[in-house]
């Protein structure tokens, strides 16, 4: 069973002569062992105008949700393919680091998201890149799903009883007589009806070749027999067999081709699976890093809007211990309530909505 691993990115303004991180760490980690904390360095991004920040802030949470969804879809796809939990699969690493290590050692990728770009340009770049990854995932996973369904369908055909299963791998050219005048009928009968069938098949219809019945295959409940007769009486023979509650399986020699097609489908599925695993392992880090960079933009934008400029705030990465969320939130509330009750609308820390915190709080939730 997977567990949700939650990280918080919080932010609060620095105070003269006080280290915000030390204060938070003292009360949540050193004194109470409720959380693992790490200073989180946010870069000096371009602020732009107040209106542009407000507009961008309205868009960020929606984009965040979309990017998160794509990132987790890639991880789930890989889990489905290899059967390994997302947090346990070593292939789900970020430049050789585990997910917690990457978050704790985060450094802004200036080569990919140049700090000279505006915030809007950075967000658009992230959104565009992840959108393409998502489109590629849909195409590749759809292809694999289609192949899997086709293979499963063929396997079902080959695994049923003789009344319904494919006969492609049971009947060979040696079982068939096919000339201008003669044809071969394939009859499925219950095992308990074998004696009755052998006693009557020669006379059940006109122009059935005597002593032509040969057992071709059997399963737990049925026998498959071949019978040679004149072509023009095939339909009459079939009708008489059906009247006996037996089954005639229509089959032509060229129907053997699906056996080769099934083998090809199986091979295609195997190759597609290998390709999709490789793609997921290459693109998961790209999507995850884009997601975390977007979280950083969110923290920066909300901090500037909340605390003003020149910006002088400290971001902290927190990983609360399991079951300690409320206690940590209560400590943070007491620590930062001086920032103003206007930000919490009279609500206390039992409400887990980010907008009610007097400090900035952005969550990074991950299943492992």
UniProtKB/Swiss-Prot annotation:
Superkingdom: Eukaryota
Subunit annotation: V-ATPase is a heteromultimeric enzyme composed of a peripheral catalytic V1 complex (components A to H) attached to an integral membrane V0 proton pore complex (components: a, c, c', c'' and d).
Source organism per UniProt: Dictyostelium discoideum
A UniProt-annotated Pfam family: V-ATPase_C
Keyword Transport attached: yes
UniProt GO cellular component terms: contractile vacuolar membrane; early endosome; lysosome; pathogen-containing vacuole; vacuolar proton-transporting V-type ATPase, V1 domain
InterPro entries assigned to the protein according to its UniProt record, in alphabetical order: ATPase_V1-cplx_csu, Vac_ATP_synth_c_sf
Protein's UniProt name: V-type proton ATPase subunit C
Family of the protein in this entry: Belongs to the V-ATPase C subunit family.
GO molecular function, one term: proton-transporting ATPase activity, rotational mechanism
Leader sequence residues: none
Keyword field: Hydrogen ion transport, Ion transport, Transport
Function text: Subunit of the peripheral V1 complex of vacuolar ATPase. Subunit C is necessary for the assembly of the catalytic sector of the enzyme and is likely to have a specific function in its catalytic activity. V-ATPase is responsible for acidifying a variety of intracellular compartments in eukaryotic cells.
